[in-house]
Amino acid sequence: MTADSALYIPPYKADDQDIVVELNSRFGAETFTVQPTRTGMPVLWVPRERLIEVLTFLRQVPKPYVMLYDLHGVDERLRTHRRGLPNADFSVFYHLMSLERNSDVMIKVALSERDLNLPTATRIWPNANWYEREVWDMYGITFTGHPHLTRMLMPPTWQGHPLRKDYPARATEFDPYSLSAAKQDLEQEALRFKPEDWGMKRHGENEDYMFLNLGPNHPSAHGAFRIILQLDGEEIIDCVPEIGYHHRGAEKMAERQSWHSFIPYTDRIDYLGGVMNNLPYVLSVEKLAGIKVPQRVDVIRIMMAEFFRILNHLLYLGTYIQDVGAMTPVFFTFTDRQRAYKVVEAITGFRLHPAWYRIGGVAHDLPRGWDKLVREFLDWMPKRLDEYETAALKNSILRGRTIGVAQYNTKEALEWGTTGAGLRATGCDFDLRKARPYSGYENFEFEVPLAHNGDAYDRCMVKMGEMRQSLRIIEQCLKNMPEGPYKADHPLTTPPPKERTLQHIETLITHFLQVSWGPVMPANEAFQMIEATKGINSYYLTSDGSTMSYRTRIRTPSFAHLQQIPSVINGSMIADLIAYLGSIDFVMADVDR
C-alpha cells in the first residue's frame, strides 16, 4: 500500500463476526473462548502457546489487520464477575484494526501470577515495542524477545508496578518522601544515556559520533520530552525518544474515582482538547449503562467538540509556524482562539477544562443568546483562515523547510499506529466521523481533508482543511439544533435532572447517592473511540458492578505518533526534526497520561 493507492473503506459493521468464522476455520473453535461485551468488536481469549500464531494469521489474512491499535494489561485478581472466562491473575489484550474491513478484533491472553511471560509481538507490528514496555512498567509482565524491555513511563529507579491492584493508589498510602543528596545523584546517574544499551556506537569508521539531548525542556519538544540524538555533524544517525516526565497515573486514578467524578480528569489528558476528551469516556460509560441520549444532546456535544477541534488546530498552526522561524502568526492565532473561548465560556462556564459532558447528557442546557455568539464566530473565522493560508502557508521559507521533510506513506503510518491528520496526509481517507459515525455525526455533511505526500507540510494543510470543515459542522448545529431535554431520562443519568428533585423524594435520594457515591454500572466491558484533535482517542472501560471502574484504559494518539519518530527522521538534519515535531501536533499530557 502506497501513499497514492486508493484504500476502500467499507461501511462499518459493529461486532463483525466474519473474522471469528475465519479464525475458527483456521484454528478450530475450541481454541478460543468468546467473551460477550459491549465493546462493539469480537473479543476472543486464546491460549498463550498459540498467541503468536493467531496474531500472525490476523496480520497476514486477506484484508489484514495491519494496525496494532492498542496493547495493554489488566490485573484480574480482584475481579469478581468473570463467569465463563479463562482463569487468570493477569491478562493482556491486543486490539487490532483492519481498515480494508473497517472492523476490529480483540485478542486476550490469560496469565498466572507465577509465570508472567509472553512472546513479543514486535516482529509482527513494530509499534508493539512501546506498548509492551508500558505493560512491563505497569504490571511486571515480561515479553520474551523484546529488543529493549525497560521502564516506559516511570523513572528507571522506580520500584514496583503501579497498575497492579496491590500497589498504593494514593500518596497518603506511601511513606513520606525525602530526597537525599546521595539519592539525587543516583537518580541523575540513572538518567544518563548509555549508547551501548541501545546498540549504538560511539565511533564510526572515520568519525566520532556526538550524542545530544534535545529536551526534556527544549521549546521545540512541546513539553517535558527528551530525544537523545546520535549525530554525525548535523545529520541524525539514530535517536531515542524518552517519555514519562508528564506521567500522572490517570488510569490508576480512574480506579479510585466514581464514574461521574472521573470526568474532570479526562479534560487533562489532551489538555487542549477540552470537552473532546469527555466524549469517548461518557459514550463508553453510556454503553455500559444502556443510555441513549436525546438528539439535542448529540448535537450540542458535536458542536462543542468541533469548537475545541478549531481551538486545538489554531494553537497547532501558530506554534508550528513559530517552530520554523515565523514569530508573528502565533499572536494572531491566539487572538482568534480568544474569540472561540468567548463562545465556549458562555456556554459551559469554563474555558480550557470545562468538564461539561455528563453521563447521559451535558451539565446544563444552552444559555440564552448562544446562537448569536456562535454566528459571530462563524462570520469571523473563515476570513482569518484565508489570511493564514495566504500570508503564512504559502510563504516560501515555510514551504522550503517542510515540503518533502519527515515523509512517510500509508503503509508505514498504519504499521506504527498513526491516526488523524498524520494518516490522512498520506492519502488514506479514514476519519472515524465518516468511517464509523458516533454521537450523530452521520447526520452532518462535511468532507474529509486529504493530502498525498505525507510530509510535514501536508500534515499542516490537512489541519487547515479540518478547521474549515469544523466550521461547516458548527454551522449545521446552529441551523438545526433540535428541541428537547439536555439529559436522558434514565436511572443512571448522572446527575439526574435537577428539576424533579424539588418535588420527588425518590429522585432526590438517587441524586444524592449518584453524586456522593456514584452510579453503579452493570458488570461488563465497553469501548468507544473518537476522531479527536490529534488522532483517534479511546476509552476501554471494565466494570465489575461497582461505583468505580475496575480498569480504565486510555489510548491516546500522541503516544503512537512519538514512537514513530526514529523511523521517520533518521538520516535527516536536526532542523528537519524541529519541523517534524511541530507537524505532529502533540502535547505530553496526551502521551504520558
Curated annotation (Swiss-Prot):
Topology in the lipid bilayer: Peripheral membrane protein
NCBIfam families (alphabetical): NuoC_fam, NuoD, PRK06075.1, PRK11742.1
Swiss-Prot/TrEMBL keywords: Cell inner membrane, Cell membrane, Membrane, Multifunctional enzyme, NAD, Quinone, Translocase, Transport, Ubiquinone
A single GO cellular-component term on record: NADH dehydrogenase complex
One function term, GO molecular function aspect: NADH dehydrogenase (ubiquinone) activity
InterPro entries: NADH_DH_suC, NADH_DH_suCD, NADH_Q_OxRdtase_suD, NADH_quin_OxRdtase_su_C/D-like, NADH_UbQ_OxRdtase_30kDa_su, NADH_UbQ_OxRdtase_49kDa_CS, NDH1_su_D/H, NiFe-Hase_large
Protein family according to the UniProt entry: In the N-terminal section; belongs to the complex I 30 kDa subunit family. In the C-terminal section; belongs to the complex I 49 kDa subunit family.
Protein name as it appears in the record: NADH-quinone oxidoreductase subunit C/D
Listed EC numbers: 7.1.1.-
SUPFAM superfamilies: HydB/Nqo4-like, Nqo5-like
Renumbered residue ranges of the record's region NADH dehydrogenase I subunit D: 208-593
Function: NDH-1 shuttles electrons from NADH, via FMN and iron-sulfur (Fe-S) centers, to quinones in the respiratory chain. The immediate electron acceptor for the enzyme in this species is believed to be ubiquinone. Couples the redox reaction to proton translocation (for every two electrons transferred, four hydrogen ions are translocated across the cytoplasmic membrane), and thus conserves the redox energy in a proton gradient.
Subcellular location: Cell inner membrane
Catalytic activity of the protein: a quinone + NADH + 5 H(+)(in) = a quinol + NAD(+) + 4 H(+)(out)
Annotated region (NADH dehydrogenase I subunit C), positions in chain: 1-184
Subunit annotation: NDH-1 is composed of 13 different subunits. Subunits NuoB, CD, E, F, and G constitute the peripheral sector of the complex.
